[in-house]
Amino acid sequence: MHCPFCSATDTKVIDSRLVADGHQVRRRRECTLCHERFTTFEGAELVMPRVIKRDDTRQPFDEDKLRGGMLRAVEKRPVSMDQLEQALTKIKSTLRATGEREINSEMIGNLMMEQLMHLDKVAYIRFASVYRAFEDVSQFGEAIAKLEK
């Protein structure tokens, strides 16, 4: 690995640890030329399935879009970034585990609602109201009643 400070090609690994529930390796490295230290993270690059939208268009899976939707739902709620990242990891793992090359956007929405239900009930209702396009108060009541079961 090239040193980010002096661009030397020779660095040595000082320390390695598993992070992100064992899905990444954190390595502490030192340049043999300038002796600066830096951290790298290594993880498997896994291919996500393409997303089939409601209008039948297809697009690449966008993790930022998934994260943004979850962040909007949990905004100002007592949900830590670690909890949110774990939920995102579960969603992505479930999508990969289907083995499909393409998945419906509806499946992603349902997985997001499932994770939000476990994280925070208010965040779940927020997301469901937009995702399911609630039009009146009775639909909110039905969603809340479903949570109370």
From Swiss-Prot:
Pfam families: ATP-cone, Zn_ribbon_NrdR. Residues 49-139 form the ATP-cone domain. Transmembrane segments: none annotated. Its cofactor is Zn(2+). InterPro entries: ATP-cone_dom, NrdR-like_N, RNR_NrdR-like. The keyword Membrane does not apply. Keywords: ATP-binding, DNA-binding, Metal-binding, Nucleotide-binding, Repressor, Transcription, Transcription regulation, Zinc, Zinc-finger. The keyword Transcription applies. Binds 1 zinc ion. GO terms for biological process: negative regulation of DNA-templated transcription. GO terms for molecular function: ATP binding; DNA binding; zinc ion binding. PROSITE patterns: ATP_CONE (PS51161). A zinc finger (unnamed) spans 3-34. Negatively regulates transcription of bacterial ribonucleotide reductase nrd genes and operons by binding to NrdR-boxes. Belongs to the NrdR family. This is Transcriptional repressor NrdR.
